[in-house]
């Protein structure tokens, strides 16, 4: 074969003679292809039965399978309303799911706080507190926010609780009684509190009077009261660090003065800062002896009337600051 012919016909004679052997390979390939086709047909025949349950899943975004997750979240919602609001943001993140119990616990504590405050108010009403303003104020102010976390469970019991520095938060019944005596059904403009403590009584007073001035002689308690009152955003309380026995002559006269510590007598400076017709409520007596809740009314520029009422027990009224 010439070179030119080889270029036009690259197959040699030997190649043409071997060609008849290849049909066997093609038959085998066709047989293999047929087997594969039959297997695909067999698999295809089985697919509809296995795939049929998957069809609803493709429609799930419109309320199918994925609706189960919101449904489970709604089952938990009554116990923790706050947690239910946060559930859509949780997704599949582990951190969000682990935070949910804390949110639920906080919501439960808030609800419990409201319920126990209402029960506390019912006890106050049963014990003779009748002024609706005082009852509403006692119901509104969260006492557990003014005590140590370890004592929060006892916050709505009728008990005095320690707040540090040898001081206490007064019993709810005593707080309500003193404020009711000071108000006597009147509209209070200016009220002076001696002994801020943790700030609880000042918060209650702020819902009964237009302006509340409160003095604390213990600097750490003064700072603590500011921190306790800050979340409540009470606009009409003015806290002062100073000697409560001196009062606040610059802000006088006061319609009412409430003293949250017991002295052997009522300081003369405080009597002078009481407005005509004003009322002062204070425990009077010795620390180791009998203390009596005393009401003093200023009936004239140089005349006061005193009434001795209930037996009580308070921390001592001291002068100076620390």
UniProtKB/Swiss-Prot annotation:
Q: What class of enzyme is it?
A: transferase
Question: Pfam families given for it?
Answer: PCMT
> What SUPFAM superfamilies does the database record attribute to this sequence?
S-adenosyl-L-methionine-dependent methyltransferases (SSF53335)
Q: Where is the composition biased (Basic and acidic residues)?
A: 14-29
Record keywords, A-Z = Cytoplasm, Methyltransferase, S-adenosyl-L-methionine, Transferase
Region: Disordered, residue numbers: 1-101
Q: Does the keyword Kinase apply?
A: no
What subcellular compartments does it reside in? Cytoplasm
Q: Residue ranges under compositional bias (Low complexity)?
A: 33-51, 76-91
Name the Gene Ontology molecular function terms of this record. protein-L-isoaspartate (D-aspartate) O-methyltransferase activity
Q: One GO BP annotation here?
A: protein repair
Intrachain S-S bonds: none
Q: Which reaction does this chain catalyze?
A: [protein]-L-isoaspartate + S-adenosyl-L-methionine = [protein]-L-isoaspartate alpha-methyl ester + S-adenosyl-L-homocysteine
- EC number(s) on record? 2.1.1.77
Catalytic-site annotation from UniProt: 170
Q: Show the CDD domains listed in the entry.
A: AdoMet_MTases (cd02440)
Q: Does the keyword Cytoplasm apply?
A: yes
A single GO CC term for this protein reads: cytoplasm
Q: Which HAMAP family match?
A: PIMT
Role played: Catalyzes the methyl esterification of L-isoaspartyl residues in peptides and proteins that result from spontaneous decomposition of normal L-aspartyl and L-asparaginyl residues. It plays a role in the repair and/or degradation of damaged proteins.
Return the similarity comment.
Answer: Belongs to the methyltransferase superfamily. L-isoaspartyl/D-aspartyl protein methyltransferase family.
Q: What is this protein called?
A: Protein-L-isoaspartate O-methyltransferase
């Amino acid at each position: 074969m010439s070179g030119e012919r080889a270029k036009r016909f690259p197959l040699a004679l030997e190649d043409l003679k071997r060609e008849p052997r290849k049909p066997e390979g093609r038959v085998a390939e066709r047989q293999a292809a047929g087997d594969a086709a039959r297997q695909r047909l067999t698999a295809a025949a089985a697919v509809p039965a296995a795939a049929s349950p998957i069809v609803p899943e493709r429609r799930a975004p419109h309320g199918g399978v994925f609706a189960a997750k919101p449904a489970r979240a709604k089952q938990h919602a009554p116990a923790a309303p706050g947690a239910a609001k946060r559930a859509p943001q949780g997704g599949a993140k582990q951190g969000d799911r682990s935070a949910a119990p804390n949110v639920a616990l906080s919501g439960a504590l808030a609800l419990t706080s409201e319920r126990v405050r209402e029960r506390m108010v019912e006890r106050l009403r049963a014990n003779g507190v009748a002024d609706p303003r005082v009852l509403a104020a006692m119901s509104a102010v969260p006492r557990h926010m003014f005590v140590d976390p370890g004592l929060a469970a006892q916050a709505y019991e009728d008990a005095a609780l320690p707040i540090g520095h040898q001081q206490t938060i007064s019993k709810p019944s005593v707080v309500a009684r003193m404020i009711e005596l000071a108000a006597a059904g009147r509209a209070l403009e200016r009220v002076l509190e001696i002994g801020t403590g943790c700030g609880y009584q000042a918060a209650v007073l702020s819902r009964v009077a237009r302006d509340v001035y409160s003095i604390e002689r213990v600097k750490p308690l003064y700072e603590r009261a500011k921190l306790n009152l800050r979340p409540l955003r009470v606009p009409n309380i003015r806290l002062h660090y100073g000697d409560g026995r001196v009062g606040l002559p610059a802000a006088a006269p006061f319609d009412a003065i409430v003293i949250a510590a017991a002295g052997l007598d009522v300081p003369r400076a405080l009597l002078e800062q009481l407005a005509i017709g004003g009322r002062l409520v204070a425990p009077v007596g010795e620390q180791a002896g009998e203390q009596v809740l005393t009401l003093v009314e200023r009936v004239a520029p140089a005349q006061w009337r005193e009434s001795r009422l209930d037996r009580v027990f308070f921390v001592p009224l001291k002068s100076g600051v620390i």
